[in-house]
Regions:
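Beta-propeller folds
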Residues: 2-209
Length: 209
């Protein structure tokens, strides 16, 4: 029998790549889940909604083809508690094993509007009522109000290699695999956070080969 020829284009399009699934996020209705898919042909990504029972796609919640601000792609995404808003990370820059900074966009599933809200920040977290986003930047904590678009600084004493507010130090991240050291109260009115004081820890240089 004649052998089918394989083209370079087919290889780079991923025609022969094994099929798989990235991490899924279950929706609160327990009947559906979302997956971040990629389309190599159009160089775009989609947040798609699927049905657990049939495993078939129900709809596309967001397609980067429709949003030039996301041309660099989606690194991760998080839903608000009511699942009416999505916080999207892109242009992530690693710090240590788990920690990173990224730019964040807020997408409204009702209005279909995409807005850049945060730049070079860590661990943005929706308040339970979905009206605010707490985040860390340069060792300090902040709260962004979605309606007013105003940002309030919560701590001011953050300093590299000295004071860390709301983010774990390297040891906690490496040994316990968690980065965010703050959380909202149930009524969305308060933040609890850990403050690390490393000001007495001596510094030294080490060559890496």
């Amino acid at each position: 029998t004649a052998q089918q020829k394989i083209t370079v284009e087919e290889i780079y399009r991923g025609e022969f790549r094994t099929k798989g699934m990235d991490a899924l996020q279950s929706m609160k209705n327990t009947n559906q889940y979302t997956v971040l898919n990629s389309d190599r042909t159009t160089r775009s990504q989609q947040i798609d909604l699927y049905d657990f029972a049939t495993l078939k796609k129900v709809s596309t919640l967001l397609d980067t083809k429709s949003h030039t601000d996301l041309a660099d792609g989606i690194d991760s995404y998080t839903f608000s508690n009511d699942e009416k808003q999505i916080l999207i990370a892109n242009n992530s820059n690693p710090i240590f094993r788990h920690s990173f900074t990224a730019n964040y966009y807020l997408y409204s599933l009702n209005s279909k509007n995409l807005t850049k809200v945060l730049e070079n920040v860590q661990e943005p977290t929706f308040s339970p009522d979905g009206t605010k986003i707490a985040f860390a930047k340069e060792n300090n904590l902040f709260v962004y109000d979605i309606a007013s678009k105003n940002t309030a600084q919560i701590t001011t004493d953050g300093k590299k290699n000295a004071i860390i507010n709301g983010i774990t130090d390297w040891v906690y991240e490496e040994e316990f695999a968690f980065v965010r050291a703050f959380d909202w109260s149930a009524d969305s009115k308060k933040l609890a956070f850990i403050r690390f004081d490393e000001s007495e820890v001596p510094e030294f240089s080490m060559s890496i080969f």
